[in-house]
């Protein structure tokens, strides 16, 4: 495949599919890096694992990742179709890759060779209601590919079509959907398939297929919103005049602190801006276009009846006899005569997001959420800063601190160690820098109205007290240092638990090389949601390296860049202070300043090992791979790297293994010659802490194909 200026083009037909050739332009020199893997299944594992960094869009006309994965799937489907189903189960449950899993599952549903196997794996690969919808949407695309026997993998001919008019649900897909739908409970459906979400889906789809009708609908929705706001204002005015209090809603809002008013105004302006220029999909495929109503209709779903009735919006039975006849013993509650004849609907699930949106970021809200165990582990860790700012009770602090390092909660959290590190940074910032105290945070329209009512109903004396309280808002305060230290210690312990639970001990002596050159300051793909406050390749490399170090029987940690006035070598071995993450990070960043900003691989270090007969079992390289062949100074350097490693292999340790992690995921890696194959030179493209599992498995001699097969069989209870 050729890539020019980061734009994907159609791969050359004459190349074998497993020969991935990336051609880029760098300093007017052509760079060619070839990765060749003879086993189609191993290649498929590698290209799907690369999605850890950034998943493909799958809906663009010429999406390169979709092309590569589809070609790899077609090859494996001819030799071992069941393995594709097993891979989907593995990458969804172990690597937490969602969209690519759904694409692979859809492929299995469509392709004739995988259809006999997918039904027994489907329910373990599809976990959420949204996953089920996405699988069905991908299936519509793959049915189009299947019609041409997968010879045309581009979508230009259908991007502007109204795909809802040509929906296809074949028997295999229908059976899988019916089976999975029965596993969802009403709480899950309440999060993902409410009537309001269905309307939003159809509204966005309308923006692509019928622009004129969409404009009319948008205008009508805006008018309805303004009418509701006016009705609320008039109702409040009337109510207060009847009680002799002429203070209306506008007066009540003015009584609130100006800072709060500013926040409310900012939110309202953002809403207006969104209404003027909402995000519009570029094609029908980029817009979600299926709902659970569609699945019920096309897949003939009839059970569980009560949930089906609610999604379809059928009327509640008028009598108890009709109720029993309709739902029988499967009814979730006894007959309620007050609901007779009314339209049934899936209730919106009570979640922590809804509570915060309605009531604001206050201590009382957080206390209630945490004490009632309504705050999931991941949400709790991501919101530590908000919890600290809200000023929760000591009891709540104690609950949170204990829960952070609870082994079972950590194991089930599926959290990136980078996100744990971000939590430490958030707590440390709150302790050292502090924040401005706030009594009220952003809340939704309903919450704002309730806040206004609260002000209106106060007596004059209470209003004066409130104004006095508000003058104290905005003071610069810091979190108690003792509390902050407890939080940090708890998170550090959680990191150790997470690494120990998910990673076997790496035997022998492991040398970890972390690139700290200037190019490593580039931002990582994935954003705050995936990596938290750890945003650059440098931070990712250091944190990941420290994770590896924790599980090594014996280790050496090196940073490398280029020589400087302070150091005549391009690398430094750093003696780290124990296993604590923050002190180790600080030490590494401090030592980084002694090196230059260029990128040289420390082959001299390997020469030194050879000279001193230092036994090293594993080398782990964490870099953006600017050291790969083709970059500046590489003709000399590249040759030296190969010669140094080959000499060490011949004279000291013939079984040494090298793990090269390309954090940017571009497929660039050092070319070490034919002596190094996929068994002793493992190239990993992309960034994830699941890389740790790969290193552990490969270091122990495990075959990833067999690991995946065994995992999937255990999941479905056949092993």
From Swiss-Prot:
Choose one Gene Ontology CC annotation of this protein and give it: telomerase holoenzyme complex
Q: Where in the cell is it found?
A: Nucleus; Chromosome, Telomere
Q: Which GO terms describe its molecular function?
A: DNA binding; telomerase activity; telomerase RNA binding
Identify the EC number(s).
2.7.7.49
**Record has Repeat as a keyword:** no
Q: Which InterPro entries match?
A: Telomerase_Complex_Comp, TROVE_dom, TROVE_dom_sf, vWFA_dom_sf
Listed GO biological process terms: telomere maintenance via recombination
EC main group = transferase
Principal localization reads nucleus
Note the PROSITE patterns from the entry.
TROVE
Q: Does the keyword DNA-binding apply?
A: yes
Q: Name the reaction it catalyses.
A: DNA(n) + a 2'-deoxyribonucleoside 5'-triphosphate = DNA(n+1) + diphosphate
Gene3D superfamilies in UniProt? von Willebrand factor, type A domain
Recite the UniProt keywords alphabetically. Answer: Chromosome, DNA-binding, Nucleotidyltransferase, Nucleus, RNA-directed DNA polymerase, Telomere, Transferase
Outline the extent of the TROVE domain: 24-508
Q: How does it assemble?
A: Telomerase consist of two subunit, p80 and p95 that form a 1:1:1 complex with the 159 nt telomerase RNA.
List, alphabetically, the PANTHER family matched.
TELOMERASE PROTEIN COMPONENT 1 (PTHR44791:SF1), TELOMERASE PROTEIN COMPONENT 1 TEP1 (PTHR44791)
Q: What does this protein do?
A: Ribonucleoprotein DNA polymerase that catalyzes the de novo synthesis of telomeric simple sequence repeats. Subunit p80 binds tightly and specifically to the telomerase RNA suggesting its association with a region of RNA secondary structure.
Q: What name appears for this protein in its UniProt entry?
A: Telomerase component p80
Q: What is the native source organism of this protein?
A: Tetrahymena thermophila
